[in-house]
Swiss-Prot record:
It comes from the Bacteria. CDD domains: SIS_PGI_1, SIS_PGI_2. The lineage of its organism: Bacteria, Pseudomonadati, Pseudomonadota, Gammaproteobacteria, Pseudomonadales. The keyword tRNA processing does not apply. It comes from Pseudomonas putida (strain W619). Its EC number is 5.3.1.9. Pathway: Carbohydrate biosynthesis; gluconeogenesis; Carbohydrate degradation; glycolysis; D-glyceraldehyde 3-phosphate and glycerone phosphate from D-glucose: step 2/4. The keyword Aminoacyl-tRNA synthetase does not apply. The gene is pgi. Pfam families: PGI. Catalyzes the reversible isomerization of glucose-6-phosphate to fructose-6-phosphate. PANTHER family: GLUCOSE-6-PHOSPHATE ISOMERASE. This is Glucose-6-phosphate isomerase.
């Protein structure tokens, strides 16, 4: 039977048990010593694909570690799982759906059947619709109610309808097309809409309402606020269609809102929100960078898809990163993973990967609903470049937790200023080096002696300057951020998450935990506004409701 119908006890597999024994043998493994003993270690534990270079030599592994981790991937049936996903089998078991975000980046001429229907013509039909719309807006042919061309596009969406598109449009800002500015409105916080709308003119603004169901609370509330603002600024109901379009599978609701049917871009239930930037949800990306660059983004992701399907596991970038995550999370006690981009334009990648990883693998039951046998997804956190060095890197270096990290850095800057980029790149490398090397007590004492301190002061200060080292990290290098390379990078992390879900036996493509808060939120709201008099289910929530009602004005 297919792997997803027979969730396994991964801890009972021979490779898992061998890894437990190997972990004990690696207790005193020193990366410092490993590099000193093997001049080829960097070559052995690095690889290139799809415009990305991965150095994973600064990890608590040797060749036996990698071999055993690869055996684990083989024993959980990873190759069959990969084939199942790409061929359209139902691997989202709890919702009875295939998982086919990869279909969105497949080239013209490919065939892929879902329920006996080839979906690829429809995929490329929507891509052509995107191309046509973007062309009309960029050429000034799509005009607002005053017949002026559109200058600003506001994407109204949250979660996957926001994080992925925001990441890509910001990361590819050097590729931005002139004449159209893209903005994002996600949170149901009036201050966000206030600050955004203060810099817009209704007559030249186009809103994209991105919601698969067209009933996402935050998105609908913001869409209604945008509509009210548009009318207050001089727009009319009759001309509303010029200023609002939608990406949704609920055409009726979008039409009822006032959006013309021809301006509604479809979504499919086999594309999850956090995997949807490749679909019409990526419309703001195409508007920001142009459809030619958007298609390059898709092509880059497709090359990673090919690598993922065909490369042997020991040379497969997403598989190796996934296995390293399992190694640290399940055998070394790591509970979080840091994403550290050394590039201003990539500053939002951590937010996207938080949703991608934590919403996918934050699960506590196997695909059949029984409890998991081991820990699953880690906390994903981090931030941009040198800023982190002056904030939380201290904990990475001298804290008590083992926190693996991914450093992401380009070789070439779009905006060279003197020798800034050389220093940025040097800082990235030196941070990973410092995590690995650390500083011994002897080195700390010698350093203090060189500064002229007496022995009594050295004895007091040296312990504080000792840095354990042996902290693992990966370094991902790109020559220069481009649509194609960014597509490959994001797709790589998508596949990494999937691989880990297969190993743990969980479903990476549902998110039932998100739904509970939505359901409870309705009752809390009704109690806040006084339309429901019954007390909340617990005293804490009711107390906080009472506190709000006693002090809120308006």
């Amino acid at each position: 039977m297919a792997y997803y119908r027979t969730p396994h006890d991964v801890t009972a597999l021979p490779a898992w048990q061998a890894l437990q024994q190997h972990r004990d043998a690696m207790q005193d493994f020193s990366m410092r010593e490993a590099f000193a003993a093997d001049s080829k270690r960097f070559d052995e534990f690095s690889l290139s694909c799809c415009g990305l270079f991965l150095d994973y030599s600064k990890n608590l592994i040797n060749e036996q570690s990698r071999d055993l981790l690869v055996q684990l991937a083989e024993q959980v049936g990873l190759q069959d799982a990969i084939k199942s996903m790409f061929s359209g089998e139902i691997i989202n078991a709890s919702e009875g759906r295939p998982v086919l975000h990869t279909a969105l980046r497949r080239p013209v001429g490919d065939k892929l059947s879902v329920n006996g229907v080839n979906v690829m013509p429809e995929v490329h039909k929507v891509l052509n619709q995107i191309t046509e719309l973007v062309g009309r807006i960029h050429d000034g042919l799509w005009r607002g109610y005053s017949e002026k061309p559109i200058t600003d596009v506001v994407n109204i969406g949250i979660g996957g309808s926001f994080l992925g598109p925001e990441l890509v449009s910001e990361a590819l800002l050097p590729y931005a097309q002139r004449g159209v500015r893209c903005h994002y409105l996600a949170n149901i916080d009036g201050s966000e809409f206030h600050e955004l709308s203060a810099n817009l003119r209704a007559e030249t603004t186009l809103f994209i309402v991105s919601s698969k169901s067209f009933n996402t609370l935050e998105t609908l509330k913001n869409a209604m606020a945008a509509r009210t603002w548009y009318l207050a600024q001089g727009g009319s109901e009759a001309e509303l269609y010029r200023h609002f379009i939608a990406v949704s599978s609920n055409k009726a609701a979008a039409v009822a809102f006032g959006i013309r049917e021809e301006n509604i871009f479809p979504m499919w239930d086999w594309v999850g929100g956090r995997y949807s930037l490749w679909s019409a949800i990526g419309l703001p990306i195409a508007l920001a960078i142009g459809t030619a660059n958007f298609k390059e983004l898709l092509s880059g992701a497709y090359t990673m898809d090919q690598h993922f399907q065909t490369a042997p596991f020991e040379k497969n970038m997403p598989v190796l990163l996934a296995l390293l995550g399992v190694w640290y999370g399940n055998f070394w006690g790591a509970r979080s993973h840091a994403i550290l981009p050394y590039d201003h334009y990539l500053r939002n990648i951590t937010k996207h990967l938080q949703q991608l990883d934590m919403e996918s693998n934050g699960k506590s039951v196997l695909t059949d609903g029984t409890p998991v046998k081991t820990d699953t997804g880690p906390v994903i956190w981090g931030g941009v470049g040198c800023n982190g060095q002056h904030a939380y890197h201290q904990l990475l270096h001298q804290g008590t937790q083992l926190i693996p990290a991914d450093f992401i850095v380009p070789v070439v800057s779009f905006n060279p200023v003197a020798d800034h980029h050389q220093w940025l790149y040097a800082n990235c490398l030196s941070q990973s080096q410092a995590l690995m090397l650390g500083k011994t007590r002897e080195e700390a004492e010698a350093e203090l002696r060189q500064k002229g301190l007496n022995e009594a002061d050295i004895e007091k200060l040296a312990p504080h300057k000792v840095i354990p080292g042996n902290r693992p990290s990966n370094t991902l290098v790109v020559e220069r951020i481009s649509p194609r390379r960014l597509g490959a990078l994001v797709a790589m992390y998508e596949h990494k998450v999937f691989v880990q879900s297969v190993i743990w036996g969980i479903n990476a493509f549902d998110q039932w935990g998100v739904e509970l808060g939505k359901e409870l939120g309705k009752g809390v709201y009704q109690r806040i506004v006084g339309s429901l008099e019954d007390s909340a289910e617990d005293g804490s929530t009711q107390g906080l409701i009472n506190y709000f009602r006693g002090r809120h004005r308006g």
